[in-house]
Design a protein with these regions (language model features):
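Nucleic-acid endonuclease domains
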Residues: 1-96
C-alpha cells in the first residue's frame, strides 16, 4: 500500500493536494508507477468520505486501507491514509 498524506504536519494541504501534475511511486514489480496527482486525490478523497474519514480500529502496525491516521500523539497535525496499489493502478497510469 502507498502512504498518501493529505494534511501536512503544520495542518495545511499536503503533496496530494499540491501543484504537481504527476506523482511517481517506486515499485518492486516494475520500477515506477506514475499517476495524475488530481486523479489520485479524487479517488482517495472519495474513499475517505465513504468512511467518513474514520480512523483505524486496528493496532498501529496493521495497515487498514483508507483509514485516517495521524501523529497527534506527537503534537503533529498531519493526516494520511494507506491506499492499495491495486486501486492506484486502476487510475490512468504509466509504468516505467
Amino acid at each position: 500500500m502507498a502512504c498518501v498524506e493529505y494534511v501536512g504536519v503544520a495542518g495545511f494541504h499536503c503533496w496530494v493536494q499540491g501543484e504537481a501534475d504527476y506523482i511517481a511511486f517506486k515499485r518492486i514489480k516494475y520500477p515506477w508507477l506514475v499517476v495524475n496527482r488530481q486523479a489520485l486525490w479524487d479517488m482517495v478523497k472519495q474513499k475517505l468520505e465513504e468512511r467518513n474519514y474514520s480512523p483505524s480500529l486496528k493496532p498501529w502496525y496493521e495497515k487498514e486501507a483508507y483509514a485516517t491516521y495521524d501523529r497527534s500523539f506527537f503534537g503533529k497535525q498531519d493526516k494520511f491514509c494507506w491506499a492499495p496499489f491495486e486501486d492506484i493502478e486502476e487510475l490512468e497510469h504509466i509504468k516505467l
